[in-house]
Amino acid sequence: MHAGDDPVFRIRGLTKTYGSGLTEVRALAGVDLDLQEGELIVLLGPSGSGKTTFLNNIGGLDVPTSGELKYRELDLAAADEDRLTQYRRISVGFVFQFYNLIPSLTARENVALITEISRNAMPAEEALGMVHLGARLDHFPAQLSGGEQQRVAIARAIAKRPEVLLCDEPTGALDVQTGIVVLEAIERVNRQLGALTVIITHNAVMADMADRVIRFSDGRVQSIQQNTQRALPSSLKW
């Protein structure tokens, strides 16, 4: 982490509301945060606390109702859809709970879908090697375990060398041992690529592997915990 550098994200008073009048729901209620290059951040909080809305806003999948949201010099709060699409395509990798792989394509081909439309992308083989799937390049999703499919999804997300990697419950559909393998892949990518990595989870044990743990409650940041050192995923117990 480079605390003295300009942040990757500068966030001030970030607010997101859905609906209006009696049906208005405030998903984010004035979030202030700086997110730094190379950090690994774990977001915790109950369902409905604002974690996913926050991730969608910094990922350019949604826009805030009010407040400041800057990625480097780009004002995401004011960007039009074309600029947000360009931002997502170039700068952000997404990993979700469900893998969204194309069944008729091999692991290599699923990753290549991204490399073919990205600038400065790494070869699909290199991305799959980073998640230890070099021996599964030509396997189809149905021939892979759930954990292997999630690692293909991670390889697909990182092949464009994103500055930001956003993970929403990446181990939610996996057993403990498989989940640890997936977390090892995410940690390795964070360390080797230097991507700012944000992980949403309901599993508080993952907090130990983070640089910072940010807890959300009722659309606000409830607390921020700075870890003095990061635990290896293999040491986590849950």
Report each predicted region and the residues it spans:
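ABC-family P-loop ATPase nucleotide-binding domain
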Residues: 1-17, 223-238
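ABC family nucleotide-binding domain
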Residues: 7-216
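Extended alpha-helical regions
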Residues: 160, 179, 222, 232-233
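H-loop (His-switch) and adjacent beta-strand-loop-beta switch element
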Residues: 213-226
